[in-house]
Amino acid sequence: MQQLGERLLKGKTGAIVAINPANGEILCIATNTPSGSDVRQAIGKPQAPGSTFKTAQALTLLSEGVITPETKVSCVNGVTDGNIKVGCHKHRSPLALKDALAQSCNTWFLMTFASMINDDFMYETKDEAITTWRSYMQSMGLGGPMHIDIEGEQGGLLAGADYLNRRYKNRWDGKTIWWAGMGQGDVTCTPLQLCNLAVTIANRGWYYVPHIHQDTKNQRYLTRRHTKVHQDAYAPVIEAMHLAVEKGTAASIRTTYPICGKTGTIENPGADHSAFIGFAPMKNPKIAIAVYVEHGGFGADLAAPMAGLVIEQYLKGKLTTASEAKAKRISAQKIRESPR
């Protein structure tokens, strides 16, 4: 699996991280850069997570009661507020949570996130709202180093009250930071953290600190960490992630076994970055994965099919003839810099 990951990343800059959800063991940590393999690409280079982050947003919003699985938001190619325009691809409208996540509707996640931050009935201040939001994200292993047993780890960014008040001089609200609702702006994560996010969803609310050494006796890596997310929030999100692979933005995986996943397309100067998080099988998951390819385009273009191949290799022990041909095609693609 490690060799396959390295082969898929040939000629590209990015990382593939896979973790066993049952015990936190790192199964694969393949990386590539213009100067060769560098583990910091997976654990020490936080970047915007893009729409993969919508899974964590949905779990938080459900847990706080800001939304229900039936909450619908209308979207016509995006949303405009004053001189701010955020685009979205064409899809039917309005959408409830399951389809909003499967189709990766930007409008849905921007508007629901803003409604949480601006809710002065549920929260006395916007500082309280953003602090509450941040605490959920931190409980899922985001926003700080996880203290894995590999040197070079960095924690990433999760906008908090102090940071926002300092950056925007106390003049901010939900729409000032609403890009965080779709994993852009004031939020960054490493591929390791994104893989661990997939672990927490696969396990419906808990994880072990990821570690590379399987024979560790250190209690740091043997103690379950529980998220703040309400237990009943996981089912609709997992169903939506399964729908994303079956009929949504991650359908390019095309597997015969049930994978749950979420693509991410990260806006970037030049060509977008391609990302994917997921786990398989849907029941009793054996592997969680995150793939991040710089300048790889849409999440469905590279990250999702790469993840599907690595998952197949792990669960089946080998690739089918068709999958091997796909792996060769991906390996032959060279993407070092933005083609724009």
Question: What is each model feature region?
Answer:
Residues 1-20:
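Beta-lactamase-like hydrolase cores
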Residues 221-222, 306-340:
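Short, gly/Ser/Thr-rich active-site loops of penicillin-recognizing serine hydrolases
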Residues 14-50, 59-299, 332-340:
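Beta-lactam-recognizing serine transpeptidase/beta-lactamase-like catalytic domain environment
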